[in-house]
Amino acid sequence: MESRKDMVMFLDGGQLGTLVGKRVSNLSEAVSSPLPEPPEKMVPHGCLSPRAGPPTSRERGGGGQEEEPVDGLAGSAAGLGAEPRSAGAAMLGPGPPVPSADSLSGQGQPSSSDTESDFYEEIEVSCTPDCATGNAEYQHSKAPGSDALGSSPTSGSEAPKSNGGSGGSGSQGTLACSASDQMRRYRTAFTREQIARLEKEFYRENYVSRPRRCELAAALNLPETTIKVWFQNRRMKDKRQRLAMTWPHPADPAFYTYMMSHAAAAGGLPYPFPSHLPLPYYSPVGLGAASAASAAASPFSGPLRPLDTFRVLSQPYPRPELLCAFRHPPLYPGPAHGLGASAAAAAAAGPCSCLACHSGPANGLAPRAAAAAAASDFTCASTSRSDSFLTFAPSVLSKASSVAALDQREEVPLTR
């Protein structure tokens, strides 16, 4: 006990007493402040504080000089009820240094704001067509986050870096948006006059030249690229319409002739269609030399113009005399279809009553068709067809027509 009293008296009167007094004053200051945070964390970004400067000489040297006495003090005052002093000393003792944001960024460890800016840069570069609104919403939602990042305990040099990164990413996103808006094309709404003029030009020539395209662009007040794309789409539509007619005419060209003649008679074609002239899609077998020459010299020897297939197929058959196209043997190879005796009987029966042969001089087809019929080695007949043609009976024919009973055959039912 005496040794302990001597130690207490020595502490009260000695040099260690003064040091402990200084420590106790520091402890009282620390207890008076509610949260002992480091000074650099408490300082906002544009403000300077007297405590934010470099530490004083007492704080620099106090760590090494006072560490041993504080440990000795804690060991000696353990039995004398000096737990508050030892706790305060342990609290005020030099702990591990808190690494600043500058040191973290210098060591290569990315902070949270840098990671977020990199993540948003990757998102903003891949811009959608609605990127203008997306950028506005993103900037609006990002503003509170940037304020929170600015008030968070980071260094002053980190905030301009993050703001610069987000600004650069925003400019990149704006450039990407403008490029995508320029790449996006909107559907052009043509007027009826423009469509009529373009259709007329397409019937005249499928492939329009560039000078003609420039004239059309100036006349219709349309871009030249739009006219070019319209002609491309129109050619594809023409091709689809031709392919839609592949059901009858590869096996039976006469039925295709009937369909085209019916379309021309109903007003589906902007030009007359001669049913007696051979189709340019085929090489007819059985034609004489004069007939082939007249067909080649005719203005219809080029490719056929498009027709509205669905309008033709949806209408009933009002003109039975147009079926004379089925009674023309030159469109078929003789031995293949068995036209021997039936063709001879049809030739001896009488003249034809088809539209192309007996139409008036108004449409200008009578002389040409008559010359073709006279030059060929057959005579057009008005009698009923032979049974060899009934295999390709179309279901679009009306049952009320005079030839409906012949067209409908039980062996080959066709349903569409």
From Swiss-Prot:
| Cysteines joined through disulfide linkages | none
What keywords tag this UniProt record?
Answer: Developmental protein, DNA-binding, Homeobox, Nucleus
Q: Which residues bind DNA?
A: 183-242
Q: Where is the composition biased (Low complexity)?
A: 72-82
Q: What Gene Ontology terms describe where this protein resides (cellular component)? A: axon; neuronal cell body; nucleoplasm
Q: Where in the cell is it found?
A: Nucleus
Read off the InterPro entries from this record: Even-skipped_HD, HD, HD_metazoa, Homeobox_CS, Homeodomain-like_sf
One GO BP annotation is: embryo development ending in birth or egg hatching
Residue ranges, annotated region (Disordered): 30-120, 138-178
Q: Which CDD domains match?
A: homeodomain
Query: What GO annotations for molecular function exist for this entry?
Result: DNA-binding transcription factor activity, RNA polymerase II-specific; sequence-specific double-stranded DNA binding
The annotated regions of Polar residues compositional bias extend over 102-114
Q: Which Pfam families match?
A: Homeodomain
Q: Which family does it belong to?
A: Belongs to the even-skipped homeobox family.
Task: Describe the task this protein carries out.
Answer: May play a role in the specification of neuronal cell types. May play a role in the dorsoventral specification of mesodermal cell fate.
What's the protein here called?
Homeobox even-skipped homolog protein 1
Q: Give the species this sequence originates from.
A: Mus musculus (Mouse)
Gene encoding this chain?
Evx1
